[in-house]
Amino acid sequence: MNAQTERLSLRGSAGVLEALRDAPVLVEGVPPRGVAVIAHPHPLFGGTMDNKVVQTLARSFVQCGWVAVRFNFRGVGASEGAYDEGRGETEDYLTVVTQLAQAGPLALAGFSFGSFVTAHALQTLWSQRTIEKIVLVGTATSRFEVAQLPAEAHERTLVVHGEQDDTVPLADVMTWARPQSLPVTVVPGGGHFFHGQLPLLKSLVVRHLSSTAT
């Protein structure tokens, strides 16, 4: 993805966690804006950190000056352990934050099952850290009980969903978002994986990351 990509092995509660860290190319002396941690879709349905939507999210953050960290949940790729229905995966997410984003600006992002995990990680992190940006794509509200977001987080949050998502129907996401008065950006004609619309998805994310709402 980038000339400054590192492959990392972290120690999680279930063993080794495999991760990739993509760093932006910046003018000398200019620090990154912060660290973004990005979670992949469902491990039992082929989800990995190399998923195209996850890569698109990483590229978006890197373009905007963030260090982007992708990782494989337990039991995926070289990550040890086994699928744990979101509980252990949330631990994995928090482990990555603790080890690779100990201080400084932090952004959270996820796709599908990864958005479910991200929302639950946010519940733990919100009172501990300043979360500057949150990006949830194809949020798996029809398959999991996705945590509501703190009201104070809404201005920092981008929720994107495809109009014709046949994996997680748009109506289910609206049912989750409505009680929170949480805006949802709908991609017309978009499916769950945004085939043919990844450039549009990237532009939406970049625009959100470039906004000053914090």
Q: Model-derived features: where do they sit?
A:
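Serine-hydrolase catalytic machinery in alpha/beta-hydrolase-like enzymes
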Residues: L10, V16-A103
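Active-site nucleophile loop of the alpha/beta-hydrolase fold
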Residues: P41-H42, L136-F144, G162
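Acidic catalytic loop of the alpha/beta-hydrolase fold
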Residues: S142-R143, E163-V168, H192-F193
